[in-house]
Amino acid sequence: MARKRGGSGSKNGRDSNPKYLGVKLFGGQHARAGSILVRQRGTRIHPGENVGRGKDDTLFALAPGVVTYLQRKGRRLVSVCVENRPS
């Protein structure tokens, strides 16, 4: 039997890659259709009007407008208020 363990002495020295989660556009900022509003794990913030949800729970704008955050029934919601511009 060996008196000492072989090679690799340290079990540490690993780290995962950063995921860059969080709010990307804050309230009052303008969003284009398709722009990412929030990157998250799980639905910490729920989609409101004109906001879609990706398979990784990313929230994105479905229409151009101004981003608004509100709380309703104990849930945080993010919506995009569409601006009606006269053409």
From Swiss-Prot:
<dbReference type="GO" id="GO:0022625">
    <property type="term" value="C:cytosolic large ribosomal subunit"/>
</dbReference>
<feature type="region of interest" description="Disordered">
    <location>
        <begin position="1"/>
        <end position="20"/>
    </location>
</feature>
<comment type="similarity">
    <text>Belongs to the bacterial ribosomal protein bL27 family.</text>
</comment>
<keyword id="KW-0687">Ribonucleoprotein</keyword>
<protein>
    <recommendedName>
        <fullName>Large ribosomal subunit protein bL27</fullName>
    </recommendedName>
</protein>
<dbReference type="InterPro" id="IPR001684">
    <property type="entry name" value="Ribosomal_bL27"/>
</dbReference>
<dbReference type="InterPro" id="IPR018261">
    <property type="entry name" value="Ribosomal_bL27_CS"/>
</dbReference>
<keyword id="KW-0689">Ribosomal protein</keyword>
<dbReference type="GO" id="GO:0003735">
    <property type="term" value="F:structural constituent of ribosome"/>
</dbReference>
<dbReference type="Pfam" id="PF01016">
    <property type="entry name" value="Ribosomal_L27"/>
</dbReference>
<dbReference type="GO" id="GO:0006412">
    <property type="term" value="P:translation"/>
</dbReference>
